[in-house]
Amino acid sequence: MTDSSFLSDLPLAGELISTNFDSWPEWLKTEFTEHSHDGEVGSRLLSENDRVRVWEIRLAPGERWHAHRHVLDYFWTAINAGRSRQHTFDGTVREVSYDAGETRHFHFGPGEYLLHDIENIGDTELIFSTVEHLDSANAPLPLTTGRK
């Protein structure tokens, strides 16, 4: 794909499960290709103005949010405790445990991005609030649905 060495500086969470694409099914590889420029970083766009986009991600146990691309500086906050599995465009797979209120911040330089999915592997609903800063080094990706 592309150079992902900058990812080592991002606050990626969780336990590293896999480091290459060998464990990925073909449908998942296809999804990452088809969604490689998908800026829908949440399941519902709650608010947008000239400074920020505020998203919600709400996943039932076993549910996943498809591959999507982050290009804007952003942060997420876990609304409740839970667990997820994430596949990342560099082939890594991580399993992550979250505490309620846990927050992580991400910064992207020009041309940098994070392409990943998220699946709820816990026993309870997993809810996040994600805030993207529109005044970042990269232009915002266009939104196709926004699910507002």
Show where each model-derived region lies.
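A short, N-terminal "cap"/entry segment at the start of jelly-roll beta-barrel domains
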Residues: 2-55, 88, 93-115, 119, ...
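Short, surface-exposed loop/turn motifs at beta-strand boundaries within globular domains
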Residues: 39, 47-52, 60, 69-71, ...
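Residue-level marker of beta-strand positions
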Residues: 64, 83, 103-105
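His-enriched metal-coordination microenvironments in redox/metal-binding proteins
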Residues: 66-71, 116, 120
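Glycine- and acidic-residue-biased ligand/ion/polar-headgroup-sensing regions
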Residues: 70-91
